A protein has these predicted regions:
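Mg2+-dependent phosphoryl-transfer enzymes with acidic/Ser/Thr/Gly-rich catalytic loops
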Residues: 2-3, 22, 182-274
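Short, surface-exposed amphipathic charged segments that create phosphate/polyanion-binding patches used
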Residues: 77-82, 133-136, 268-273
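Non-catalytic pre-domain segments flanking phosphatase-related domains
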Residues: 1-9, 56
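Conserved acidic, metal-coordinating active-site core of Asp-based
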Residues: 110-213, 219-221
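Residue-level signal for inorganic ion chemistry
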Residues: 43, 67, 129, 195, ...
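Residue-level detector of anion-binding/catalytic polar loops
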Residues: 38, 175, 230-231
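Active-site phosphate-binding/coordination module
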Residues: 21-121, 236
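Structured N-terminal alpha/beta-domain signature
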Residues: 6-20, 29-31, 40, 44, ...
């Protein structure tokens, strides 16, 4: 088998749910497996959340969690010395973001300085998170297992509390994003940095200049797509692209079909030209 000539980076959510009998992404996944193409999954969720999908599709390649908080490499995947890597169960983890413990403490400190009342994920159980987020308790529990960020909500009026909280957070080199109905505090998380890092590892390990392909759909995928050699953008819904993303990446390839069907089409097209 020849060494692969392409690496595929993708937002994991685009693969959809593989629980149905007819799984729309199955053909592309089978071709990826047959050709031994590296498929790197990225998520703004946690490792525990992504593991659910990885088990279902038999994913055995590196992955990136919490919006670039950490890169996880299966044990023995690269025969390279990785400076700064830490053991995390059966993976080596290269952290880019600050830890969830640091983020949790910062949430509390910033809230006190801002005069805001907050409730952190760490203060809630799975049932409470499930009730607020409208997810299953299993999904809520997986979401609680954060490693590079902390989620919370404002107990009072968020419109009044959030601006002051964000100002103080920024001054302390933290960033905040709204993940309805929660907010999230993080620092250092960078999907683009993770993509460039793992691309370099592949090129060093295989002694080949592989082409990197990025597949995304929303503005939050910008750093992933920018860090890839070629960007493919799927619509959020049929005929509805994220115009902010298109404006930033005028040379990207637009795919007309959303979701797992569009993802499947994109990957098969990429592989047919490789």
């Amino acid at each position: 088998m020849l060494a692969p000539r392409v690496i595929i980076f993708t937002t994991a959510s685009l693969l959809g749910s593989p629980t149905r009998t007819e799984y729309e992404a199955s053909e592309a996944l089978a071709e990826i497996e047959r050709r031994k193409i590296p498929l790197v999954l990225l998520t703004r969720g946690t490792r525990a959340q992504l593991e659910i999908l990885r088990r279902k599709i038999g994913h055995a390649h590196p992955f990136v969690t919490e919006g670039g908080g950490g890169l996880f490499l299966p044990d023995g995947y690269f025969a390279l010395r990785l400076e700064g890597a830490k053991r995390a169960a059966r993976y080596l983890c290269v952290p880019f973001g600050r830890t969830s413990e640091e983020a949790g403490a910062a949430v509390q400190d910033i809230a006190e300085q801002a005069g805001a009342e907050v409730v952190r994920y760490a203060d809630m159980n799975a049932r409470e998170i499930s009730s607020n987020a409208g997810t299953s308790e299993r999904e809520a529990e997986a979401s609680r297992e954060r490693e590079f960020s902390e989620r919370f909500f404002f107990a009072g009026n968020a419109d009044l509390a959030a601006p002051s909280f964000e100002k103080i957070a920024t001054e302390r080199n933290w960033r905040i994003r709204h993940c309805e109905p929660f907010w999230e505090l993080y620092s250092g998380n960078d999907e683009g940095k993770a993509v460039r890092y793992v691309t370099r590892l592949y090129r060093e390990a295989l002694r080949s200049r592989l082409r990197s392909v990025g597949i995304g759909a929303s503005f939050e995928d910008l750093s992933l797509l920018t860090a890839s050699d070629q960007a493919f953008i799927l619509p959020l819904r049929a005929g509805d692209f994220d115009e902010r993303l298109l404006a930033k990446l005028p040379n990207s390839v637009r795919i007309d079909v959303p979701g797992a069907v569009g993802w499947n089409q994109t990957v098969l097209d990429v592989l047919s030209r490789t």
